[in-house]
Amino acid sequence: MEDQAFIRNKSGSLTAVCCAVLVLIAGCSSSPKNSEPASSNPFSTNGTNNASAIKINKLRTFGDSYTDLAYTSPRAMTNWAVEVSSMANGLENYAIGGAKAASTSSIDFATQLNNWNTTNSAITDKDLTVVYFGYNDIGRGGTSDNFAAARAGYTDGVNRLIAGGATNGNNRMFVTLITDWSRTPGISDSLHSQVVTWNNFVASVANSNPNIIAVDLYTVFNRVQDKPSDFGLVNATDVDKERSYTDYLFFDTLHPGSKGQEIIARVFKHYLTRGWNWASTLDAGTSATNQLNQDLDNNLLKAFNQTATTSQGLRLVPLTTSNTDGRRSGRDSRVFNLNQTARNNLEESVANGVALDFAPANSGIWSQGRLGVALTQNAQSTRLTDIEDRYSTRFNSNATTLYWMQPYNNFLFSTQLSRLDHAFTQNGLDDLLNRSVTNDRSAHTWSLEGKLRYTYAFDGLALTPWASLSQQNHTLNGGLIQSLYTSDVQFSQTKTRDIYSGLGVDLQFSPIAIGQGRKLLIGAGLNHLQSLRREALTLGMTEQINPGVQMSETIDRSRVRKTQLSLNAVVAEHKGISYGASYAVDLQKPSETKAVRVTANIPF
């Protein structure tokens, strides 16, 4: 009954607690790893276990919201699978928030495996598969059938992966011992024994196959919660959304925040590197737990802030392209906006270009932000369509933008300073007069915009209201303008200024599985843009036939009021291929502004 004593006294010796939790595992292996010689690391490129030498071919993950990108991304939260994928050539993340191992819903382990099968993405040499379930099988109230359905679903799923080659040759499978769910703020302490039962089962699955390794998050997170300062945290008990990006463990009552996700990623990386030799040879149980605790005592997993993650390096972002899962990134492409003058000329034209950015710090809340520069280009033209047309125009705008994006809790603040260079070309033709003219004009704009977003995350939906304020200073350069029917006119340089405010809300629904590995992603947006100030435009001009006469004209510029509705849908195929369609309309001028756009994103 020693185990029961430890269950009631969870604040006792950690090593003793972890050994008590896993003591039943040590002798249950049908093919014990500790009877075999040390296994070389199949992911090593040079025979060592150094992090720089590890290269996985494809990382596949199955699980729940702890792994699902649709949960972490809207919250600007680190995702452990993305972090670990820095060691791989690619990531296939099939996890879905709320999923169970038990085959009881459309998002369970079996469904995720079906989604994988429909992609025709076969397991090949040096692939790593990670299975991470259990929290939702316990739930808030505990299991009602002693995990009978969960065990069956988990076993069937693992067997399907084994049959697919997940443990053949140089391939490996990681199964994950969950953190102590009962120490999560929103869960009762009474569920501790069920966590122990579940982890014992998962460990037995690992011990049944020499190429399946149990990754012990239970032991690590108990150490984190008992002494958070060792892991760069000040609190591992309470919820604080803002500080979960910096020094608190929990984002909400059920989930760790970015720092917790970073710890999970670090544990997986440890098993792939420094911990490989013992993890691949020892059964999940007392010996493996002792070895993991020894690594923790030797500070091999503590210095998280000293290890740069993928989010801290330089990043090249292609704009107006989709992510691999078919969704556009709100943290990337939405922040780069053409100024309103250019928008009025381009209507529904979208900027294309690239951005290069980096995190301004290696730790703390600033490490979640991005500083960078974006280069974008817009173009639109109208052509002569029949004999009644007299003019065609072409408009180009090239922009260089310095930007800063900073998440804080569910807020995302972005600011950008842009220099836009515009070029206008107008061609005129009159066949009857046998006369044609070409006029080239240029202008530039300095634009400063600030935007604040806040994301409300619900089951299956992310709702993001936002507000913006911008100022633009425009300069229209002087030039000679030719006309088909009057004398040429020399225009002088002209300057003006605009101030705009914007309000809007964006909706993004969680991916919907539509069969054969495809996902349907649906989004919508409603925004209102209004000019707070538009200065009048004063034009100075001189006709060529009257060179000594300077004339001027002041043009009052009407206020801008636009309320735009946009709808978009993307079908994400496997291997990053996606197809999308969008519809946009200005509700104040619907008959004049309807626009439909169809896109395809095919990586090569």
Give the positions of each predicted feature.
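Mobile gating loops/cap/lid regions near enzyme active sites that modulate substrate access
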Residues: P185-H192, V205, I212-S258
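Solvent-exposed, glycine/polar-rich loop segments of beta-barrel outer-membrane systems
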Residues: P185-H192, K227-K241, N344, T385-T393, ...
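Gram-negative bacterial Sec-dependent N-terminal signal peptides
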Residues: M1-K33
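Bacterial Sec-dependent N-terminal signal peptides
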Residues: E2, G27-A53, S280, G285-T286
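Conserved SGNH/GDSL esterase-like catalytic core that processes O-acyl groups on lipids
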Residues: L69-A152, T286-T289, N293
